[in-house]
Amino acid sequence: MALKTLRIGTRASQLALWQANWVKSELEKRYPGLEVSLLKIKTIGDKILDVPLAQVGGKGLFVKEIEEAMLRGDIDIAVHSMKDVPTEFPEGLGLHCITEREDPRDAVISRGIKFADLPKGAKIGTSALRRQAQLLKIRPDMEMVIIRGNVETRINKLEAENLDAVILAAAGLKRLGFTDKVAEYLPTDLSIPAIGQGALGIECRLDNEEVKSAIDFFNHPATAYAVRAERALLWRCEGGCQVPIAAFGEVEGDQLKLTGFIASVDGKTSVKGSVSGPAEECEKLGITLAEQLLKDGGHEILAEVYQREVSREKEIPV
Protein backbone atom coordinates (compact mmCIF):
# COMPACT_ATOMS: atom_id res chain seq x y z
CA MET A 1 0.00 0.00 0.00
CA ALA A 2 1.37 3.41 -1.03
CA LEU A 3 -0.27 5.25 1.88
CA LYS A 4 2.40 6.02 4.51
CA THR A 5 0.50 8.12 7.05
CA LEU A 6 -3.13 8.46 8.08
CA ARG A 7 -4.53 11.12 10.42
CA ILE A 8 -7.72 10.40 12.40
CA GLY A 9 -9.92 13.21 13.70
CA THR A 10 -11.86 12.53 16.89
CA ARG A 11 -13.56 14.18 19.80
CA ALA A 12 -11.56 14.10 23.03
CA SER A 13 -14.10 12.31 25.25
CA GLN A 14 -13.12 9.00 26.84
CA LEU A 15 -15.52 7.06 24.60
CA ALA A 16 -14.56 8.91 21.40
CA LEU A 17 -10.88 8.24 22.10
CA TRP A 18 -11.58 4.55 22.76
CA GLN A 19 -13.36 4.35 19.40
CA ALA A 20 -10.65 6.24 17.49
CA ASN A 21 -7.90 4.18 19.11
CA TRP A 22 -9.72 0.98 18.16
CA VAL A 23 -9.77 2.14 14.52
CA LYS A 24 -6.09 3.12 14.81
CA SER A 25 -5.20 -0.32 16.22
CA GLU A 26 -7.10 -2.17 13.48
CA LEU A 27 -5.37 -0.10 10.79
CA GLU A 28 -1.92 -0.74 12.30
CA LYS A 29 -2.61 -4.48 12.50
CA ARG A 30 -3.69 -4.59 8.87
CA TYR A 31 -0.97 -2.26 7.55
CA PRO A 32 2.16 -2.69 9.75
CA GLY A 33 4.09 0.08 7.96
CA LEU A 34 1.32 2.68 8.22
CA GLU A 35 1.88 5.57 10.63
CA VAL A 36 -1.50 6.43 12.20
CA SER A 37 -2.02 9.49 14.39
CA LEU A 38 -4.97 11.04 16.25
CA LEU A 39 -6.01 14.68 16.29
CA LYS A 40 -8.36 15.62 19.14
CA ILE A 41 -10.96 18.20 18.14
CA LYS A 42 -13.43 20.01 20.42
CA THR A 43 -16.95 20.33 18.99
CA ILE A 44 -19.73 22.70 19.98
CA GLY A 45 -21.48 19.79 21.72
CA ASP A 46 -18.39 19.38 23.91
CA LYS A 47 -18.19 23.08 24.72
CA ILE A 48 -21.79 23.63 25.86
CA LEU A 49 -22.29 21.33 28.84
CA ASP A 50 -24.77 23.28 30.96
CA VAL A 51 -27.65 23.20 28.45
CA PRO A 52 -29.64 20.17 27.20
CA LEU A 53 -28.64 19.38 23.60
CA ALA A 54 -32.24 19.73 22.43
CA GLN A 55 -32.13 23.36 23.58
CA VAL A 56 -28.82 24.06 21.83
CA GLY A 57 -30.59 23.13 18.60
CA GLY A 58 -29.18 22.43 15.16
CA LYS A 59 -27.59 19.31 13.68
CA GLY A 60 -24.05 18.01 13.74
CA LEU A 61 -23.28 19.25 17.25
CA PHE A 62 -20.56 16.62 17.65
CA VAL A 63 -19.17 16.51 14.09
CA LYS A 64 -19.14 19.98 12.47
CA GLU A 65 -15.70 21.07 13.69
CA ILE A 66 -14.24 17.67 12.79
CA GLU A 67 -15.61 17.97 9.25
CA GLU A 68 -14.15 21.48 8.99
CA ALA A 69 -10.73 20.03 9.91
CA MET A 70 -11.12 17.45 7.15
CA LEU A 71 -12.05 20.10 4.59
CA ARG A 72 -8.93 22.07 5.59
CA GLY A 73 -6.80 18.96 5.04
CA ASP A 74 -5.82 18.59 8.72
CA ILE A 75 -7.15 15.00 8.94
CA ASP A 76 -7.75 12.11 6.53
CA ILE A 77 -10.64 10.32 8.25
CA ALA A 78 -13.02 10.95 11.14
CA VAL A 79 -14.43 8.35 13.52
CA HIS A 80 -17.94 9.10 14.76
CA SER A 81 -20.61 7.46 16.87
CA MET A 82 -23.22 6.90 14.15
CA LYS A 83 -26.00 8.29 16.34
CA ASP A 84 -24.25 11.70 16.23
CA VAL A 85 -23.86 11.88 12.45
CA PRO A 86 -26.27 14.15 10.51
CA THR A 87 -28.00 12.70 7.45
CA GLU A 88 -26.38 15.28 5.15
CA PHE A 89 -22.67 16.03 4.66
CA PRO A 90 -20.63 19.03 3.51
CA GLU A 91 -19.81 18.91 -0.20
CA GLY A 92 -16.89 16.58 -0.85
CA LEU A 93 -17.25 14.54 2.35
CA GLY A 94 -19.17 11.35 3.00
CA LEU A 95 -19.60 8.29 5.15
CA HIS A 96 -17.50 5.51 3.64
CA CYS A 97 -17.76 2.74 6.28
CA ILE A 98 -20.17 1.66 9.00
CA THR A 99 -18.65 -0.80 11.46
CA GLU A 100 -20.26 -3.87 12.98
CA ARG A 101 -22.75 -2.83 15.61
CA GLU A 102 -22.03 -3.23 19.30
CA ASP A 103 -25.03 -3.91 21.60
CA PRO A 104 -27.73 -1.46 20.38
CA ARG A 105 -29.81 -1.52 23.57
CA ASP A 106 -30.24 1.08 26.29
CA ALA A 107 -29.03 0.11 29.75
CA VAL A 108 -30.38 0.93 33.21
CA ILE A 109 -27.86 1.93 35.86
CA SER A 110 -29.47 1.98 39.29
CA ARG A 111 -28.89 0.58 42.73
CA GLY A 112 -29.61 -2.91 41.46
CA ILE A 113 -33.30 -2.21 40.73
CA LYS A 114 -34.85 -3.06 37.36
CA PHE A 115 -36.79 -0.39 35.45
CA ALA A 116 -40.24 -1.85 36.13
CA ASP A 117 -39.50 -2.03 39.86
CA LEU A 118 -38.36 1.57 40.29
CA PRO A 119 -40.58 3.47 42.77
CA LYS A 120 -43.43 5.75 41.76
CA GLY A 121 -42.11 9.20 40.92
CA ALA A 122 -38.58 7.88 40.38
CA LYS A 123 -36.06 10.41 39.06
CA ILE A 124 -34.42 9.14 35.88
CA GLY A 125 -31.31 10.70 34.35
CA THR A 126 -31.05 10.65 30.56
CA SER A 127 -29.41 12.70 27.83
CA ALA A 128 -31.90 11.91 25.05
CA LEU A 129 -35.44 13.10 24.30
CA ARG A 130 -35.96 9.78 22.48
CA ARG A 131 -35.44 7.84 25.72
CA GLN A 132 -37.40 10.35 27.75
CA ALA A 133 -40.45 10.07 25.47
CA GLN A 134 -40.43 6.25 25.36
CA LEU A 135 -39.90 5.79 29.10
CA LEU A 136 -42.60 8.34 30.00
CA LYS A 137 -44.98 6.50 27.68
CA ILE A 138 -44.41 3.37 29.80
CA ARG A 139 -44.11 5.11 33.18
CA PRO A 140 -45.73 8.58 33.09
CA ASP A 141 -45.23 8.86 36.87
CA MET A 142 -41.47 9.17 36.49
CA GLU A 143 -39.53 12.43 36.54
CA MET A 144 -36.99 12.77 33.74
CA VAL A 145 -33.79 14.69 34.51
CA ILE A 146 -31.66 15.71 31.51
CA ILE A 147 -27.98 15.00 32.24
CA ARG A 148 -24.89 15.89 30.19
CA GLY A 149 -21.24 14.90 30.25
CA ASN A 150 -19.16 11.88 29.31
CA VAL A 151 -20.17 8.31 30.20
CA GLU A 152 -18.43 8.19 33.57
CA THR A 153 -19.76 11.63 34.56
CA ARG A 154 -23.33 10.53 33.81
CA ILE A 155 -22.87 7.29 35.76
CA ASN A 156 -21.64 9.31 38.75
CA LYS A 157 -24.73 11.54 38.60
CA LEU A 158 -26.75 8.63 40.00
CA GLU A 159 -25.30 9.50 43.41
CA ALA A 160 -24.29 13.12 42.83
CA GLU A 161 -27.83 14.17 41.85
CA ASN A 162 -29.63 11.56 43.98
CA LEU A 163 -31.27 9.90 40.97
CA ASP A 164 -33.06 6.55 41.07
CA ALA A 165 -31.59 5.44 37.74
CA VAL A 166 -29.54 6.63 34.79
CA ILE A 167 -30.21 5.35 31.26
CA LEU A 168 -27.24 5.09 28.89
CA ALA A 169 -26.39 3.34 25.62
CA ALA A 170 -25.12 -0.17 26.32
CA ALA A 171 -22.47 0.13 23.58
CA GLY A 172 -20.52 2.86 25.36
CA LEU A 173 -20.71 1.05 28.69
CA LYS A 174 -19.36 -2.15 27.13
CA ARG A 175 -16.57 -0.38 25.25
CA LEU A 176 -15.39 1.40 28.39
CA GLY A 177 -15.78 -1.58 30.74
CA PHE A 178 -18.69 -0.33 32.87
CA THR A 179 -20.96 -3.37 32.46
CA ASP A 180 -20.69 -4.14 36.18
CA LYS A 181 -22.80 -1.00 36.77
CA VAL A 182 -25.73 -2.24 34.66
CA ALA A 183 -28.89 -3.38 36.47
CA GLU A 184 -30.79 -4.23 33.28
CA TYR A 185 -30.63 -3.99 29.50
CA LEU A 186 -33.89 -2.67 28.03
CA PRO A 187 -35.27 -4.70 25.09
CA THR A 188 -35.25 -2.82 21.78
CA ASP A 189 -39.05 -3.10 21.51
CA LEU A 190 -39.42 -1.31 24.87
CA SER A 191 -36.80 1.40 24.24
CA ILE A 192 -36.12 1.66 20.51
CA PRO A 193 -32.51 2.79 20.04
CA ALA A 194 -31.29 6.03 18.52
CA ILE A 195 -30.56 6.02 14.79
CA GLY A 196 -27.25 4.18 14.34
CA GLN A 197 -26.82 3.43 18.05
CA GLY A 198 -23.91 1.08 18.71
CA ALA A 199 -22.26 1.49 15.29
CA LEU A 200 -19.29 3.64 14.33
CA GLY A 201 -19.04 5.61 11.10
CA ILE A 202 -15.84 6.48 9.28
CA GLU A 203 -16.05 9.67 7.23
CA CYS A 204 -13.53 10.77 4.60
CA ARG A 205 -13.10 12.90 1.50
CA LEU A 206 -15.02 11.31 -1.36
CA ASP A 207 -12.22 12.03 -3.84
CA ASN A 208 -9.47 10.32 -1.80
CA GLU A 209 -9.47 6.86 -3.38
CA GLU A 210 -6.32 5.76 -1.53
CA VAL A 211 -7.83 6.43 1.90
CA LYS A 212 -11.17 4.89 0.89
CA SER A 213 -9.43 1.72 -0.26
CA ALA A 214 -7.45 1.51 3.00
CA ILE A 215 -10.56 1.67 5.23
CA ASP A 216 -12.90 -0.50 3.14
CA PHE A 217 -12.39 -3.48 5.46
CA PHE A 218 -14.17 -1.72 8.35
CA ASN A 219 -17.54 -1.82 6.59
CA HIS A 220 -20.00 -4.40 7.96
CA PRO A 221 -22.71 -4.96 5.32
CA ALA A 222 -25.57 -6.09 7.61
CA THR A 223 -25.00 -3.19 10.00
CA ALA A 224 -24.65 -0.77 7.09
CA TYR A 225 -27.99 -1.86 5.59
CA ALA A 226 -29.73 -1.48 8.97
CA VAL A 227 -28.20 1.91 9.75
CA ARG A 228 -28.81 3.25 6.25
CA ALA A 229 -32.50 2.35 6.64
CA GLU A 230 -32.65 4.10 10.01
CA ARG A 231 -30.93 7.20 8.62
CA ALA A 232 -33.26 7.31 5.60
CA LEU A 233 -36.20 7.39 8.00
CA LEU A 234 -34.58 10.22 9.97
CA TRP A 235 -33.78 12.12 6.76
CA ARG A 236 -37.38 11.86 5.52
CA CYS A 237 -38.64 13.12 8.88
CA GLU A 238 -36.11 15.99 8.65
CA GLY A 239 -34.95 15.06 12.14
CA GLY A 240 -31.74 15.75 13.99
CA CYS A 241 -30.24 13.53 16.67
CA GLN A 242 -31.94 15.58 19.41
CA VAL A 243 -35.60 14.99 18.54
CA PRO A 244 -37.79 12.12 19.82
CA ILE A 245 -37.39 9.89 16.76
CA ALA A 246 -36.13 6.33 17.13
CA ALA A 247 -35.52 3.56 14.60
CA PHE A 248 -33.96 0.14 14.66
CA GLY A 249 -33.14 -2.12 11.73
CA GLU A 250 -32.42 -5.84 11.96
CA VAL A 251 -31.05 -7.92 9.08
CA GLU A 252 -31.69 -11.66 8.79
CA GLY A 253 -30.33 -13.27 5.66
CA ASP A 254 -31.21 -10.90 2.83
CA GLN A 255 -34.22 -9.39 4.63
CA LEU A 256 -34.40 -6.23 6.72
CA LYS A 257 -37.01 -5.38 9.35
CA LEU A 258 -37.19 -1.72 10.36
CA THR A 259 -39.12 -0.39 13.35
CA GLY A 260 -39.67 3.34 13.84
CA PHE A 261 -41.12 5.61 16.51
CA ILE A 262 -42.02 9.30 16.72
CA ALA A 263 -43.25 10.88 19.95
CA SER A 264 -43.99 14.09 21.76
CA VAL A 265 -41.38 14.95 24.40
CA ASP A 266 -43.73 13.94 27.23
CA GLY A 267 -44.51 10.59 25.59
CA LYS A 268 -48.27 11.25 25.67
CA THR A 269 -48.61 11.24 21.89
CA SER A 270 -46.70 8.77 19.75
CA VAL A 271 -46.78 6.69 16.61
CA LYS A 272 -44.94 3.44 15.96
CA GLY A 273 -44.69 1.11 12.98
CA SER A 274 -42.52 -1.34 11.09
CA VAL A 275 -41.76 -2.49 7.55
CA SER A 276 -39.87 -5.44 6.10
CA GLY A 277 -38.25 -6.07 2.75
CA PRO A 278 -35.00 -6.81 0.90
CA ALA A 279 -31.99 -5.43 2.78
CA GLU A 280 -30.61 -4.00 -0.48
CA GLU A 281 -33.63 -1.67 -0.56
CA CYS A 282 -32.75 -0.31 2.90
CA GLU A 283 -33.12 3.39 2.07
CA LYS A 284 -36.42 2.84 0.28
CA LEU A 285 -37.71 0.94 3.33
CA GLY A 286 -36.65 3.78 5.63
CA ILE A 287 -38.47 6.38 3.56
CA THR A 288 -41.56 4.17 3.24
CA LEU A 289 -41.77 3.74 7.02
CA ALA A 290 -41.14 7.44 7.64
CA GLU A 291 -43.99 8.41 5.33
CA GLN A 292 -46.26 5.90 7.05
CA LEU A 293 -45.40 7.32 10.49
CA LEU A 294 -45.80 10.93 9.33
CA LYS A 295 -49.19 10.11 7.81
CA ASP A 296 -50.32 8.36 11.01
CA GLY A 297 -49.74 11.44 13.16
CA GLY A 298 -45.98 11.90 13.18
CA HIS A 299 -46.15 15.08 11.12
CA GLU A 300 -48.27 16.87 13.74
CA ILE A 301 -46.10 15.56 16.59
CA LEU A 302 -42.88 16.78 14.97
CA ALA A 303 -44.37 20.16 14.05
CA GLU A 304 -45.00 20.77 17.75
CA VAL A 305 -41.54 19.48 18.77
CA TYR A 306 -39.75 21.67 16.21
CA GLN A 307 -41.78 24.73 17.20
CA ARG A 308 -40.68 24.23 20.80
CA GLU A 309 -37.07 23.71 19.65
CA VAL A 310 -37.06 26.95 17.64
CA SER A 311 -38.44 29.00 20.55
CA ARG A 312 -35.77 27.61 22.87
CA GLU A 313 -32.94 28.24 20.39
CA LYS A 314 -33.75 31.94 20.52
CA GLU A 315 -33.03 31.98 24.24
CA ILE A 316 -29.58 30.38 24.06
CA PRO A 317 -26.45 32.27 22.96
CA VAL A 318 -24.08 29.85 21.19
Curated annotation (Swiss-Prot):
SUPFAM superfamilies membership: Periplasmic binding protein-like II, Porphobilinogen deaminase (hydroxymethylbilane synthase), C-terminal domain
Enzyme Commission code(s) on record: 2.5.1.61
Modified residues (S-(dipyrrolylmethanemethyl)cysteine): C241
Gene Ontology CC terms: cytoplasm
InterPro entries hit by this protein: HemC (IPR000860), Porphobilin_deaminase_cofac_BS (IPR022419), Porphobilin_deaminase_N (IPR022417), Porphobilinogen_deaminase_C (IPR022418), Porphobilinogen_deaminase_C_sf (IPR036803)
Free-text comment on the cofactor: Binds 1 dipyrromethane group covalently.
Enzyme class: transferase
One Pfam family this sequence matches: Porphobil_deamC
Example GO molecular function: hydroxymethylbilane synthase activity
Keywords: Porphyrin biosynthesis, Transferase
UniProt-listed GO biological process terms: protoporphyrinogen IX biosynthetic process
Highest taxon above the source species: Bacteria
Catalytic activity: 4 porphobilinogen + H2O = hydroxymethylbilane + 4 NH4(+)
Pathway: Porphyrin-containing compound metabolism; protoporphyrin-IX biosynthesis; coproporphyrinogen-III from 5-aminolevulinate: step 2/4
PROSITE patterns the record matches: PORPHOBILINOGEN_DEAM
Necessary cofactors: dipyrromethane
Similarity comment: family membership: Belongs to the HMBS family.
UniProt xrefs under NCBIfam families: hemC
PANTHER family, per the entry: PORPHOBILINOGEN DEAMINASE
Cited function: Tetrapolymerization of the monopyrrole PBG into the hydroxymethylbilane pre-uroporphyrinogen in several discrete steps.
Subunit structure: Monomer.
Other comments on record: The porphobilinogen subunits are added to the dipyrromethane group.
Protein name: Porphobilinogen deaminase
Gene, per the UniProt record: hemC
